[in-house]
Amino acid sequence: MAKLCCFGSSDYDLVVGRASTSSGKGRNNDGEIKFGYSLVKGKANHPMEDYHVSKFVKIDGNELGLFAIYDGHLGERVPAYLQKHLFSNILKEEQFRYDPQRSIIAAYEKTDQAILSHSSDLGRGGSTAVTAILMNGRRLWVANVGDSRAVLSQGGQAIQMTIDHEPHTERLSIEGKGGFVSNMPGDVPRVNGQLAVSRAFGDKSLKTHLRSDPDVKDSSIDDHTDVLVLASDGLWKVMANQEAIDIARRIKDPLKAAKELTTEALRRDSKDDISCIVVRLR
């Protein structure tokens, strides 16, 4: 991998350092693309388990915007590991510049295998992931496992770039691996009565019944594509895609937009950790 050069981000230690209740902003080298992020701890009695990445880097003459939300469960070690290693692993793939999609899929798999092999250190927990790579402001690759989501605004219309990996929609895969999907009254469907997503990093005790391969989607960025929103399910449980895009477009400052989205989720009584990144492309 070529040497990386990072720039355009304030509060750098929070951007790539640790989970916290935090906010910050940054921009690309020429200042045309700006981002803001806001993370708010949920009401559950455990430490913040959401981690994120938001930064621009230079590699092989290309400017890459790297954005991610990692929503952990049963501890923060797996999302912290992803924050440190997943993008690095993607960019290390020899074919990344020629075939980003294949490289992303390969790096997701290798990263999950590394997490499982270090489960004695990382614990029994796991994490969802949504990652977005913006190349030279012109092309976007989005990948995800779990229910963290990326939504793109094209002409003001919300376009969901990810697929929510939920147990009831992937029941056949789970049952084909020998697992089951519970559906208890008053609760969401769960893999083996435990996990509310059907794909995740980690979760060694459930891995034989889970998947960790991502869905990947790419899109050209044109003059009609103005905003990208990434968020954990703490936002999406209480807000529709179009609502989030409308807020992010109305508030021109992406930091203020991200804060408004997390604040509105709290107003709507979201109880989970809430993490949001708003990228203003135009």
Curated annotation (Swiss-Prot):
Record: residues binding Mn(2+) 2: 71, 233, 272
Cofactor binding note: Binds 2 magnesium or manganese ions per subunit.
Alphabetized UniProt keyword annotations: Hydrolase, Magnesium, Manganese, Metal-binding, Protein phosphatase
GO MF: metal ion binding; protein serine/threonine phosphatase activity
Residues the entry annotates as binding Mn(2+) 1: 71-72
Catalytic function, reaction form: O-phospho-L-seryl-[protein] + H2O = L-seryl-[protein] + phosphate; O-phospho-L-threonyl-[protein] + H2O = L-threonyl-[protein] + phosphate
GO CC field: plasma membrane
InterPro entries: PP2C, PPM-type-like_dom_sf, PPM-type_phosphatase-like_dom
SUPFAM superfamilies, alphabetized: PP2C-like
This enzyme's EC code(s): 3.1.3.16
Pfam families: PP2C (PF00481)
Record-annotated PPM-type phosphatase domain positions: 34-281
Family per similarity comment: Belongs to the PP2C family.
Protein name according to UniProt: Probable protein phosphatase 2C 10
Organism for this UniProt entry: Arabidopsis thaliana (Mouse-ear cress)
